[in-house]
Amino acid sequence: MIFQSCDSNKKASDAPKSKSISDLSIYHLPSKWTNQDGKDIQMKNMKGKVLVMVMIYTSCKSACPRLVADMRNIESRLPKDTKNVEFVLISIDPKVDTPERLKAFAKENQMEGDQWTFLRSSEDNTREFAAVLAVNYKKISPMDFSHSNIISVFNNVGELTYQQEGLNVNADETVQKIIEEAQKS
């Protein structure tokens, strides 16, 4: 499943939303992930929440700090009473980004609340999930990756509903989409 568009801000699905899990849901993916606390989970464990996801690596010195800042900006702009929204940062460098490293990164970036989840998995699972998000990445040196800069929004049944592409872009539409999806939850 790859969702692509030429627009810089793209709507991936305008299909009717139901409480059942559609074939387009990430909750069907069998891959196992480990969070920053060392707990193993699957995507389906996040069912019922609006997910705001981005793929990064913690040793990145260029795009990832901006993506992290964009995620924090989006989170800070949500009304305080917004419920069932989880911000998920997925590592594209699972060899370096151990659960301990992810936890330290979360602390360094003031992303320690329950709404923040950091995940890592095998290279195969990471590549599969990157394909779902239409995120491309390639190791260009022992310590560096070239990668897409996309923040994805999933509804509470795991369907991709919106993507923000680029760094430091106006996040108004992203914030609005998250609020709309959270109100449906």
Predicted regions and their residues:
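C-terminal motif of bacterial Sec signal peptides marking the signal peptidase cleavage site
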Residues: I2-S5
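Bacterial signal peptide processing site
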Residues: D7-K10
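Short active-site neighborhood of thiol/selenol oxidoreductases, capturing the structured segment around
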Residues: M43-P65, M71
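Typically the conserved alpha-helix immediately C-terminal to a functionally engaged Cys/Sec
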Residues: A63-L78, P99
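Thiol-based oxidoreductase modules, predominantly thioredoxin-like and allied folds used
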Residues: N84-D97, D114-T126
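Short, internal strand/loop/helix patches
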Residues: K103-S148
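Thiol-/selenol-based redox modules, centered on thioredoxin-like
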Residues: I140-S185
